[in-house]
Curated annotation (Swiss-Prot):
The gene is cpcT1. The keyword Nucleotide-binding does not apply. It comes from Synechococcus sp. (strain JA-3-3Ab). The keyword Lyase applies. Belongs to the CpcT/CpeT biliprotein lyase family. Its EC number is 4.-.-.-. It holds the Pfam family CpeT. It comes from the Bacteria. HAMAP family: Chrphore_lyase_CpxT. This is Chromophore lyase CpcT/CpeT 1. Keywords: Lyase. One of its GO terms (molecular function) is lyase activity.
């Protein structure tokens, strides 16, 4: 499957988002569970990194379901590490997947260091509570069902900032299938619009290694 992400033109991204907004309302609630089942698991982009070592580093990525955390929707804990430095987890955060329309709410951890590596420990994750999180309302991702994947795109306008005073905003878009997660996460200068971090060679292409990381849920 060939998927192309990431127009550099803000107007193109805005037009694409408006199209998604119109179509997302028709998304079935059953897609919430399908999307969550596809997302859950352990991923690696090792094949991509070996093929293009100049542009991509090998990364291990986890999405672990949090059945206890939210009264609505489905929660996930996600984090990753560079496979050259295994165990040094970063970008630990929490997602809330909601229906009607299908979307993702992003949360940062108030104490990032305290939860680094928690994707490997279910008992530890069971202690995670809403008081440990800070909602990032500007970082909502709208998800649209397409013929062979789910496509996600962050709200346009540069509103996703980890801290109110940040001069850089985050833009994320992705395509998800049952076996592949293709994501392009980038930072942009809020004044100039120039990219400040993230891949400049296209999205990271993660292959699912283990469909469900831990034993089946009760």
């Amino acid at each position: 499957m060939r998927i192309t992400l990431g127009s550099r033109n803000p107007e193109d991204r805005r037009s694409s988002f408006l199209h998604m907004t119109a179509s997302a309302a028709a998304t079935s609630d059953s897609d919430l569970n399908t999307f969550a089942d596809w997302l859950e698991g352990y991923y690696s982009n090792r094949a991509q990194a070996m093929a293009e070592p100049v542009w991509f580093v090998p990364v291990s990525l986890w999405y672990v379901r949090l059945p206890h955390l939210f009264s609505e929707g489905i929660g996930f804990f996600t984090e990753q590490f560079n496979e050259h430095t295994p165990g040094r987890f970063y970008r630990s955060r929490v997602l809330q997947v909601l229906a009607d329309p299908l979307r993702i709410e992003n949360y940062k951890l108030r104490d990032q260091a305290a939860w680094a590596g928690a994707s490997q420990d279910l008992q530890r994750l069971a202690q995670l509570s809403l008081s440990d999180l800070q909602h990032l309302p500007g970082c909502r991702i709208l998800v649209e069902k397409r013929a062979d994947c789910y496509h996600g795109q962050m709200l346009p306008g540069g509103g996703c900032r980890l801290n109110p005073g940040d001069s850089t905003y985050i833009h994320i878009e992705f395509d998800l299938t049952a076996q592949e997660f293709i994501t392009w996460d980038r930072g942009f200068d809020a004044t100039t619009g120039q990219q400040t971090w993230g891949s400049r060679a296209g999205p990271y292409r993660y292959q699912k290694r283990i469909p469900v990381v831990f034993p089946p849920r009760p």
